[in-house]
Amino acid sequence: VNGERPSLASYLQSLGYETVATHPYYATGWNRDKVYPWLGFEQSIFKDQYYGARFVRDYVSDPSCADKIIRLYEQKEEGRPLFVFNVTMQNHGGYDQTYTNFSPGISVDGVNSISVSQYFSLIKLSDQALEQLIDYFSGADEKTVIVFFGDHQPSDTVAAPILAMNGMQWNALDEEQQKLRYQVPYVIWANYDIDEEQNADTSANYLGAEVLKRAGVPTDAYQNFLLT
């Protein structure tokens, strides 16, 4: 991306939304400090603006990201809807080192792996951050939608022991098993009634349009095309 591009952010901005991108790491990573404005984000927030954040391993924790989202909501312009796109860092690999600020507390029976223990312990913190957001916005006066998803599965250092427990080898998966390694779960939650569905497969390029539809936000011609 080397210039302005239409995106979910620019579309929501055209509808009057305040648009904020936040990523608790370095602004120059993937040129985010340039790309986010090109995509229609009015404000970009990076690691140096996470004042007082709790660090887990080398990264800002997911609960601190939840705190940031809540503060952005509380400080937003009154009467103007808010769109926040938050890319977390807490669970970034690798998982085979020890840290003074994080002690894994979850293990898997039959697996002796620091990577597995660390990864699942980090996921527990992510669950707590999601719970924190849902608890807060359940009581919010404004209609709110939370979309929660990952960009990829953990590395083979985590997956291999789990696969082995199920009689599979990470480097000898058949085509269908390999496809499963490229799937991630997602959640769309709202503090008001929306159409409910479980185990609905989709692709990331369709997710934005799907969220707009379920949230009751008007969609444009391109988004309608994605939804057909």
What are these regions (language model features)?
Residues V1-T228:
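Solvent-exposed soluble domains appended to multi-pass membrane proteins
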